[in-house]
Amino acid sequence: VAKSGNTGNVFDLGELRRLVDELGSGSREARAAVLDATSPDDKDCDCPGCGTEVLTFPPVVLAPDDELAAAVLRVPLVLDAQRLAAWTGTREVTPEGLLPDPFLPCAELGVPNPARLHLLWVVAVNTGMVRISRGVATAGPLALSAELPSAALLGFWDGVVMDVLDRADDSLTGSSVVDDHLAEMLATMYAVSDGLSPATLVKGILQSHEVACEARPAEMRALTAALPGELQGALSLLGYCGLIELSGAGWPRLTPLGMWAVRQDLLREGHDAPTGAEVAVFADLGAAELVEAIMKRSAAPSAVTVWLESRSPEAAARELVKIAASGTAGQRGTVGTILEELGPEAEVPLREALSEPAMWRYAASWLHIRDLPAPALTPADSTWIAVDTLASLIHLGNAPEAMCEFDMLEPGEDLVRVVEEMTSVDHPDTIAVLDLLGAHHSDAAVGKAARKAAMKARSR
């Protein structure tokens, strides 16, 4: 999110899922909290375009813009920044653009400490409440009032939150660990809008810190003892900043302004964070329309969740199988991704798909993964799936992704041998896949084997 440059500030998707599961009685949507990366292993790939982890968050309902705009003017941080700007008037500042004696305004304005004053000063200057020119601070061009358009007030609020979160690099909350994991904590609270218990938040931060920062046991023991108190202080500050409030159950959750601001940040980072209205339009699409929209990238991953929830698992699977059985590799790949969201309730149409020449291998794999009776796949079947997987990515128009996908198909397996075996499977896109590998694969031996295999396939 805003502090994504910090290497310790990571999204541990597995831990987010487990944290959400601990809600127990929460809504299905909240507990599912579909937080999936499009390519979870891309961090190990050097291909262009790989390595960017895109997350999908459940749809949210935002408060109306006019209500949000009115709430901005009541945020304690905003009110104090206005007071500081008024107190400053016309005043000399240091060469760094700071107030020369931070203790004076702290005493006169009742600001608890210089760190809080610095946050207020950053917000006041960056948002235009205060202007600094030639070593002198004066009143800035921004005059906040309820007369401003909602869009202007929300734009101001967006800037305030970016300033707040950027301060995490310089001890925003007073806890270095909370600062390091602030973005993922806010994203988790965004995904579970009803709130999370402090104990759950502490557990998530500890687990993420241990994994992402490779913390030693002694550090973890000390952190386990100190973090609950540090988190309480951090939540109090975030409440002062207008981001956090307590739910009816006493659990911290994002305020309506917090939901709006965190969503803006997620969208800036390229994540899928839709509103309910944005994805509701996909519920009534047919399977063919949904698959086409996904392939054209006009439907975000969250649209799949809405589409599946609007029909029974069996009905959804039957529609999807029909598309995949008669469609292209690109359609099969897209359908396969959607089918992975379904459980054993969809068994009947998947079992029926075992009679479809282009679909039976995927159906067998789907059944096997869910511990349901299924025919065994031979090595030749695995090679066919490899060809089809690469072909699906070609249909989606991303050759670099295809290179990454090929490297991940069979970790540790001799890729040259797999390429050579591709000529023996009956797949309409075999030559196109071999041409792709021959032209773009980073391993010279694999590329050479692919070009040779393509010539062999053409000679048949």
Which residues fall in each region the model found?
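Amphipathic alpha-helical scaffolding segments comprising HEAT/armadillo-like alpha-solenoid repeats
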Residues: L235-L237, C241, H271, L285-A288, ...
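Structural detector for internal amphipathic alpha-helices that build alpha-solenoid repeat scaffolds
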Residues: G204-Q207, E292, A300-R311, K322, ...
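Basic amphipathic alpha-helical segments that dock to polyanions
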Residues: L120-T127, A226-E245
